[in-house]
Amino acid sequence: MGKVSVAEIKELMTATGVGMMDCKKALVEADGDMEKAVTLLREKGLATQAKKSGRVAAEGICTAVVKGNVGCVLEVNIETDFAANNDEFKAFVAAVADTVIETNPADVDALKATKISGGDKTVEETLQDLFIKIRENMVIRRFKRMEGILVPYVHGAGSIGVMVKLDSDIAADNAELLAAGKDCALQVAAMNPAYLNRDCLLYTSDAADEL
């Protein structure tokens, strides 16, 4: 098949988010078979992703999300700050945070193998699809899932994420309690303290001495 229609190219671009010329080449190679063209684009994207996996992902987003009494603080890295501001990348980070809250994965590898929140693919498969569009190395760096009275804080566009857990007999929706939690979160974001109080430091030192 030598030619493909503009409508076919647009359909493939809409389905994959890939550029016009790449979609045209894939359709020509696939003899106009739309499903085969999608597969070809995915295979080429995965090959490129493997080549770029060693590139440093120094930018990214930290997010902190609470739903009910369960929360997640998450860091996902990408190569450039320009790509970090991409709406689809931001949506991916938000969906991954929801996945952590909903499924409680044991670690990053388990998270990547889990079906992503609101989708029909795993987190890893969704990341691979996003790579085909953005063409930058992305890394789910770390996450922490917590339960209890939680107060989240995200600094700026996501350069810092903080989750504060409060132990209190006061109702979880008490405005003064939440304001105190917010103040603590702001302090953590500003100062990056190594421990909660002096007792925590002494406990850590004692444990190290015992070893």
Regions found by a protein language model. Name each.
Residues D206-L211:
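A short, hydrophobic C-terminal helix/tail in secreted or cell-surface proteins
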Residues G2-S205:
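N-terminal assembly/interaction segments in proteins that build large macromolecular machines
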